[in-house]
Amino acid sequence: MKGDVKIINYLNKLLGNELVAINQYFLHARMFKNWGLTRLNDVEYHESIDEMKHADKYIERILFLEGIPNLQDLGKLGIGEDVEEMLRSDLRLELEGAKDLREAIAYADSVHDYVSRDMMIEILADEEGHIDWLETELDLIAKLGMQNYLQSQIKVTD
């Protein structure tokens, strides 16, 4: 089915956002793991996998609309050097992605591409959940102090 060119362009932009997020969150997860912060590792790793699933949805939709998925035009990763910087970098990425999603959703609705719109609304709900988690973690750092926060991110195994 031949899709609207602007929808395909939006989907490719959103795909690019997801590809950056996959790599950024995966690297952050492994850095957290290396530092012994297993709870942060677990969440970031899960988020990386979720972003991969979102990317897969975009790829399938672009192909269905007879477009070509662009997996080469990647933005810059925002890799932090400490926990707070990493969480802030992830939050910036999520906020930008949510902004792009809202714009694409509005356009899809205006051209009556309800399937693309509904897919993007579902993904936006996931992104808003991640934004909420990141904001909560940054609030905890501010309230508890970094040392107490870091201590709370260590999972003792049997």
UniProtKB/Swiss-Prot annotation:
Keyword Metal-binding included in the entry's annotation: yes
GO molecular function: ferric iron binding; ferroxidase activity; heme binding; iron ion binding
Pfam families given in the database record: Ferritin
Residues noted as binding Fe cation 2 in the record, renumbered to the chain: E51, E94, E127, H130
PROSITE patterns for the chain: BACTERIOFERRITIN, FERRITIN_LIKE
Amino acids binding Fe cation 1: E18, E51, H54, E127
Cofactor note: Binds 1 heme b (iron(II)-protoporphyrin IX) group per dimer. Binds 2 iron ions per subunit. The catalytic dinuclear iron-binding site within each subunit is known as the ferroxidase center.
Catalytic class of the enzyme: oxidoreductase
All residue ranges annotated as the Ferritin-like diiron domain in the record: 1-145
Gene3D superfamilies membership: 1.20.1260.10
UniProt keyword Iron present: yes
Reactions catalysed, as given in the entry: 4 Fe(2+) + O2 + 4 H(+) = 4 Fe(3+) + 2 H2O; Fe(2+)(in) = Fe(2+)(out)
GO cellular component entries: cytosol
Residues in coiled coil: none
GO BP term, example: iron ion transport
Binding site for heme b: M52
Cofactor(s) named in the record: heme b; Fe cation
Subunit structure, as described in the record: Homooligomer of 24 subunits, arranged as 12 dimers, that are packed together to form an approximately spherical molecule with a central cavity, in which large amounts of iron can be deposited.
Function comment: Iron-storage protein, whose ferroxidase center binds Fe(2+), oxidizes it using dioxygen to Fe(3+), and participates in the subsequent Fe(3+) oxide mineral core formation within the central cavity of the BFR protein shell.
Protein name per Swiss-Prot or TrEMBL: Bacterioferritin
Species: Salmonella typhimurium (strain LT2 / SGSC1412 / ATCC 700720)
UniProt lineage: Bacteria, Pseudomonadati, Pseudomonadota, Gammaproteobacteria, Enterobacterales
